[in-house]
Amino acid sequence: DCASGPCCRDCKFLEEFTICNMARGDDMNDYCNGKTCDCPRNPHKWPA
């Protein structure tokens, strides 16, 4: 399925909702989508 990337392990996509980028500050965690090797950005922020 994939060769490398934060959402790829052993040439397979990681499962959907696997955390690929931990939250920092008011940002929320980013999760693998189970379809790509990239780590899609979560557009949401924690409420102020």
Swiss-Prot record:
Q: In which tissues is it expressed?
A: Expressed by the venom gland.
User: Where found, per UniProt?
Assistant: Secreted
Where the record places motif Cell attachment site is 24-26
Q: Which SMART domains did the record assign?
A: DISIN
- Supply the alphabetized keyword list: Cell adhesion impairing toxin, Disulfide bond, Hemostasis impairing toxin, Platelet aggregation inhibiting toxin, Secreted, Toxin
Q: Name one GO cellular component term.
A: extracellular region
Disulfide bond positions? C2-C11, C7-C32, C8-C37, C20-C39
Q: Which intervals hold domain Disintegrin? A: 1-47
Q: Recall the GO molecular function terms of this protein's record.
A: toxin activity
| Extra remark | The disintegrin belongs to the short disintegrin subfamily.
How does this chain assemble? Monomer (disintegrin).
| Function field | Inhibits ADP-induced human platelet aggregation.
Q: Per the similarity annotation, which family is this?
A: Belongs to the venom metalloproteinase (M12B) family. P-II subfamily. P-IIa sub-subfamily.
| The protein's name | Disintegrin leucogastin-A
The record lists the organism as: Echis leucogaster (Roman's saw-scaled viper)
